[in-house]
UniProtKB/Swiss-Prot annotation:
This is Enolase 2. Its main location: cytoplasm. One of its GO terms (cellular component) is peptidoglycan-based cell wall. Keywords: Cytoplasm, Glycolysis, Lyase, Magnesium, Metal-binding, Secreted. It comes from Lactococcus lactis subsp. lactis (strain IL1403) (Streptococcus lactis). The active site is at E204, K337. It is found in: Cytoplasm; Secreted; Cell surface. Catalyzes the reversible conversion of 2-phosphoglycerate (2-PG) into phosphoenolpyruvate (PEP). It is essential for the degradation of carbohydrates via glycolysis. The gene is eno2. The keyword RNA-binding does not apply. It holds the Pfam family Enolase_N.
Amino acid sequence: MTVTIENIHAREIFDSRGNPTVEVDVRLTDGTLGRAAVPSGASTGDREAVELRDGGDRLQGKGVSKAVANVNGEIYEALKGQSPFNQAKLDHLMIELDGTKNKSRLGANAILGVSMAISRAAANSEKIPLYRYLGGVDLELPQPFFNVINGGVHADSGIDVQEFLITPVKRESFRDGLEKIANIYHTLKKILADKGLETAVGDEGGFAPKLGSTENAIATLYQAIESAGYVPGEEIAIAIDPASSEFYDDKEKVYRFEGQKLTSKELLTYYENLVEKYPALISIEDGFSEHDWEGFAAQTKAQGQKIQLVGDDIFVTNPEIFKEGIKKGVANAILIKLNQIGTVTEAIEAISLARKAGYKTMISHRSGETVDSYIADFAVAMHAGQIKTGSMARSERVEKYNQFLRIEEELGKDVALASFPG
């Protein structure tokens, strides 16, 4: 019996920030169900695929009933009766149906929900795990990065840098690495509490203490790592995501950072000094604004041989924009966010481009998440090498890490473990 798509049904659910988002069910003719929920970002790149919101008074204008209607209407009509096993064909059908460059007519949140749910339905129909369906037999567990201190738009902490992350560069297994991070997380909480600092968590499960500066935050991480019994840089490394587009002044072409106005050159000097002072700092994401390609390229030239430089807002997981970045020598790694581009197929294309150009890849969650663990399977399937999906708190974050534990258990001790820098 040929299995085809029988029904596609979307609904409005709520994400981890209490905002509406899209969930999609794809039902196949063999009775199989695939379900997927779409995340949403707080700091977004200007050229990201468009998340269709309703506007108006209901739910502060953030309702997604239009996107839901597009799934239940046009998209369902276009895809019903199609085979679920040709992901690229179905994704391109939806792209053509939308007819815009940024998926603004139907909504990237509508299209991505269907794209993810189709692949999950196909995997379920084949009775194999999603990671196996997407990746075949060649699989690898990624290097995880944990956002343990939140700043920027993810928290009201007064720190301009948005994320301070730690990663277990020395680990025997995924579980071993996760246990190390759990130890540091609880140690960090105690250190903050002992200093009389806030231990409430931000959007991504990290703490949001008023530490006053980037250096204070990194120094506190060093203290937590050492107090937990590990060696900074050797066993546990540090990464930051300044999300600098958020503090870049487009008119004056300066960065309003920690009470100063910095030129691109001055900000680069700041990063160089930071890496020299804290050698455990091995990765900087979006150190320069998405509108400051020259600054980003200058950083890549100056620091690209020493540390990882990740492009997020500047590339927005868009293969065409990424090609431009490769030509201009911008960054040496790319962040992959499924909802930035809006289909599974295009995200895979961006990863393929990165591989050919010698760029590292890091899969990422969004600050508005759901308990859907799709990106965990996706990271394993794609040999992505790295993932960041929050801290060791908030179930929508921890669920992704728990999925890696399940995958590691299923694949056994022989499963490949990505290393940094890989």
